């Protein structure tokens, strides 16, 4: 990439961000856009501008985000969101502290050497030999075996020590935050009074599954056992319930149309309403609702009597017993009576609960194999696209484009954006597929599935994006050498890293300027909302569904941040300027997403920080990769003292082990000292029980309105997000 292309990419991205920020300031003040920019506050019954004012200052939202406290985030968006901001601030601190030392020391050391002047090797530059302005500020300009390399080795130690310090501090903080939130919750949390039991053996003759479960736990916990809810096969009844809810929506639309026009609407009864007999919509859907209610009630009786599965949710009268039971071994055989903490009612993946113990293990390894195969096969198109999107390779692969590419303006635009956009498009195709694979493992809860998906996406990103793109840029020119000497892979990776630096600099800049600009302005959700409201929505419920914002999407957001983290780590010493981009990315991310968490996004679940051990492990994995990369690159530079990085690699492994042993237990289970704290309100155990009843098995009788608390918390929002 030429220097002009880099400046064009950086400048246009910055201009786009500024335009989107001012657009956000203008659009967010318009009353008609309030549901798009303040849905979190609306759903909580707050005034959209509570705690702020309708000032014309375009930077007022920045002050609000900075002055908000962690407890404000917990109150409005949950503990998981607060933990995500601990992640953002921790990484920001790592890069800021690293930059304070690395920028003023490494840049002058690199700039005053002359390796690139004496030997202009194409494999030892940050931009294929054309970007000399930045080459001179990187390790590429350091002469092999030079004593200056001591500074770069010391920088690896500095970055590592800063990371250890910040991660230890963050782990302690998150552990305390989780415990405090569980102890001081103002609401009764149904999951704290329940456990999830799987792999239930066949009941003795003459006993039902429910009687068997009740007798088993009543014998073990005679004073605190309350009751059980046996999991049932609900696929058929769920279909009936979904049809019923669909008919109710269509009836509401028909009634709204009748109220607006005084003409009774009609529709055809055939395929997609395009063929068949034309009928009165109100009468037709009323009839279908009555028929579906009758079917639902009949199917409920059948399901409860005949379709009980080998899993159950067991309830206790106090939290301590539930926490103790979740940590205890109930059967000598590991594949019988498997007990874990119960997830939130809205989190349960009901169809996975019946999957047997050994089946879950087999599924897990099969999924791991499928993910590995997917990574390998996905690397082919990513490597190919990354290779041909460098202009030199693009002209080789598609010679007829040469006259177009030679035009200066087009060349600059293509070099600025083509490779990065191609990469972003390829990555956008993955999340749903990886979520499907994660759920196929037999995972019981939504939050656990999201953590599993995030882990897969992280390794996919590192292997395909970081390593794949790094090698792909020199794929055509080094493929023959790799065939002749397969053992030269590590050397090829190490020598390819510097010349991919400018690609990743541009990629990070595109992500934080354009990505966060679109996030703040919410242009796309705004357009979709107004189009739906104008042309599709007929009822208030449909309008509410149109602006419902969803959550922060941790399954994709955390791995995307981890990719930037990995890139910044691995280039922090090779090309220290990337630290500036890393600081801007996580600084802007903290600021903009803080605003979104306080005003926009609504959490779809609450795991009280269980994402943190996953985040901590991936940060350490990125640090470990950074240390390996620097060991390899110092070796390429023929610096014999690179061997001094070997102890650092083992220190990282030991640090990870110590953190897991000290902190992880408090995230895997609820500590008894936390569970024993007295609640502010007395729990209604019947409400706790009913919170776990699936929608399709809930009664449709007139007394449903009395169940608030747990039922309203877990079912109302779930109904909106599922619609």
Swiss-Prot record:
The chain crosses the membrane at residues 6-26, 91-111, 149-169, 365-385, 417-437, 457-477, 509-529, 573-593, 615-635, 638-658. One of its GO terms (cellular component) is chloroplast membrane. Its main location: plastid. Pfam families: PHM7_cyt, RSN1_7TM, RSN1_TM. The keyword Amino-acid biosynthesis does not apply. InterPro entries: Csc1-like, CSC1/OSCA1-like_7TM, CSC1/OSCA1-like_cyt, Csc1/OSCA1-like_N. Residues 1-5, 112-148, 386-416, 478-508, 594-614, 659-723 are cytoplasmic. The keyword Chloroplast applies. GO terms for molecular function: calcium-activated cation channel activity. Residues 27-90, 170-364, 438-456, 530-572, 636-637 are extracellular. It is a multi-pass membrane protein. It is found in: Plastid, Chloroplast membrane. Belongs to the CSC1 (TC 1.A.17) family. This is CSC1-like protein ERD4. It comes from Brassica juncea (Indian mustard).
């Amino acid at each position: 990439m030429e220097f002009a292309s880099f400046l064009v990419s950086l400048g246009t991205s910055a201009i786009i961000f500024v335009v989107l920020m001012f657009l956000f300031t203008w659009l967010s003040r318009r009353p008609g856009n309030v549901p798009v920019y303040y849905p979190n506050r609306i759903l909580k019954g707050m005034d959209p501008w509570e705690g702020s004012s309708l000032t014309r200052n375009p930077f007022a939202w920045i002050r609000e985000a900075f002055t908000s406290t962690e407890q404000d985030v917990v109150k409005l968006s949950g503990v998981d969101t607060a933990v995500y901001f601990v992640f953002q601030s921790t990484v920001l601190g790592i890069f800021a502290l690293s930059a304070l030392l690395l920028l003023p020391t490494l840049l002058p050391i690199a700039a005053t050497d002359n390796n690139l002047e004496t030997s202009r090797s194409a494999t030892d530059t940050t931009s294929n030999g054309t970007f000399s302005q930045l080459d001179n500020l990187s390790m590429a300009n350091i002469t092999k075996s030079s004593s200056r390399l001591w500074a770069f080795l010391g920088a690896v130690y500095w970055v590592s020590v800063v990371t250890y310090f910040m991660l230890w501090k963050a782990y302690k903080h998150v552990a305390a935050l989780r415990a405090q939130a569980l102890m001081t919750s103002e609401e009764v949390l149904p999951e704290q009074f329940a456990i999830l039991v799987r792999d239930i053996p066949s009941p003795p003759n003459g006993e039902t599954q429910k009687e068997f479960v009740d007798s088993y736990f009543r014998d073990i916990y005679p004073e605190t056992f309350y009751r059980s809810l046996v999991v049932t096969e609900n696929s058929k009844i769920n279909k009936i319930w979904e049809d019923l809810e669909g008919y109710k929506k269509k009836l509401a639309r028909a009634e709204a149309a009748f109220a607006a026009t005084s003409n009774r609407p009609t529709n055809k009864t055939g395929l997609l309403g395009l063929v068949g007999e034309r009928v009165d919509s109100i009468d037709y859907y009323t009839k279908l609702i009555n028929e579906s209610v009758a079917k639902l009630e009949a199917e409920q009786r059948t399901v409860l009597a005949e379709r009980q599965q080998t899993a159950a949710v067991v309830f206790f009268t106090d939290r301590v017993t539930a926490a103790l039971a979740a940590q205890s071994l109930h059967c000598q055989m590991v594949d019988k009576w498997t007990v874990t903490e119960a997830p939130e009612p809205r989190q349960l993946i009901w169809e996975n609960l019946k999957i047997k113990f050994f089946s879950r293990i087999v599924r897990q390894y099969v999924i791991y194999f499928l993910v590995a195969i997917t990574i390998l096969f996905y690397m082919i198109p990513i490597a190919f696209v990354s290779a041909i999107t460098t202009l030199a390779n693009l002209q080789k692969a598609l010679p007829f484009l040469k006259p177009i590419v030679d035009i200066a303006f087009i060349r600059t635009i293509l070099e600025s954006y083509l490779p990065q956009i191609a990469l972003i498009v390829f990555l956008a195709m993955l999340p749903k597929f990886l979520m499907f694979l994660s759920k196929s493992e037999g995972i019981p809860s939504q939050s656990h599935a999201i953590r599993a998906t995030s882990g897969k996406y992280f390794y996919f990103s590192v292997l395909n994006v970081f390593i794949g793109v790094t090698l792909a840029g020199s794929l055509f020119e080094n493929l023959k050498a790799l065939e002749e000497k397969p053992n030269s892979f590590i050397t090829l990776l190490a020598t390819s890293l510097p010349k991919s630096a400018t690609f990743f600099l541009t990629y990070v800049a595109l992500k934080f300027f354009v990505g966060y600009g679109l996030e703040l302005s919410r242009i796309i959700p705004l357009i979709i909302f107004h189009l739906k409201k104008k042309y599709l929505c007929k009822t208030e419920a449909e309008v509410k569904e149109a602006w419902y914002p969803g959550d922060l999407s941790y399954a994709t957001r955390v791995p995307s941040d981890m990719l930037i983290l990995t890139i910044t780590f691995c280039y922090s010493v090779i090309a220290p300027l990337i630290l500036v981009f890393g600081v801007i990315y996580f600084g802007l991310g903290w600021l903009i997403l803080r605003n979104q968490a306080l005003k926009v996004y609504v959490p779809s679940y609450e795991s009280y920080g269980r994402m943190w051990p996953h985040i901590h492990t991936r940060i350490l994995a990125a640090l470990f990769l950074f240390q390996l990369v620097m060991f390899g690159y110092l070796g390429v530079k023929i610096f014999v003292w690179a061997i001094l990085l070997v102890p650092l690699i083992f220190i990282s492994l030991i640090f990870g082990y110590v953190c897991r042993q000290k902190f992880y237990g408090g995230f895997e289970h609820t500590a008894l000292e936390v569970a024993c704290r007295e609640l502010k309100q007395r729990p209604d155990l019947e409400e706790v029980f009913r919170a776990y009843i699936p929608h399709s098995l809930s009664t449709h009788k007139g007394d449903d309105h009395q169940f608030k608390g747990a039922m309203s918390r877990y079912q109302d929002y779930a109904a909106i997000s599922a619609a």
